[in-house]
């Protein structure tokens, strides 16, 4: 019996791919913004067997040392606990906020896992009704 091993997510490196994902769904959080787009929507030629992840840390987050540290923390958070939650054939771009540098690692992983999972219709309805009516 053959077992299919789940592939780790690949990295997004090209500007065109980052721009394509930018037009997809946005999931906001206190530590980062997660942009998600299915690769079928981007008409990608390559295989859609794995998820792809890109990281964006802008200059407003600090100098190069701080930006690189944020990227390392996010990469490790994705590697440690989120490869099972990511859908194959989907691109994810994580745009970091400055608070991601000093946030506890467990909260970073928990926030990522909460944002990676797609919302159901019921959750979207509950979130949209914030005025209590």
UniProtKB/Swiss-Prot annotation:
Residues 115-125 have a biased composition (Basic residues). Its EC number is 3.1.26.5. One of its GO terms (biological process) is tRNA 5'-leader removal. This is Ribonuclease P protein component. SUPFAM superfamilies: Ribosomal protein S5 domain 2-like. It comes from the Bacteria. GO terms for cellular component: ribonuclease P complex. Keywords: Endonuclease, Hydrolase, Nuclease, RNA-binding, tRNA processing. One of its GO terms (molecular function) is tRNA binding. The keyword Protein transport does not apply. RNaseP catalyzes the removal of the 5'-leader sequence from pre-tRNA to produce the mature 5'-terminus. It can also cleave other RNA substrates such as 4.5S RNA. The protein component plays an auxiliary but essential role in vivo by binding to the 5'-leader sequence and broadening the substrate specificity of the ribozyme. Consists of a catalytic RNA component (M1 or rnpB) and a protein subunit. Gene3D superfamilies: 3.30.230.10. NCBIfam families: rnpA (TIGR00188). InterPro entries: Ribosomal_Su5_D2-typ_SF (IPR020568), Ribsml_uS5_D2-typ_fold_subgr (IPR014721), RNase_P (IPR000100), RNase_P_CS (IPR020539). It comes from Bartonella henselae (strain ATCC 49882 / DSM 28221 / CCUG 30454 / Houston 1) (Rochalimaea henselae). PANTHER family: RIBONUCLEASE P PROTEIN COMPONENT. The gene is rnpA. It is an enzyme of class 3 (hydrolase). Belongs to the RnpA family. The keyword RNA-binding applies. It catalyses: Endonucleolytic cleavage of RNA, removing 5'-extranucleotides from tRNA precursor. Residues 114-133 are annotated as: Disordered.
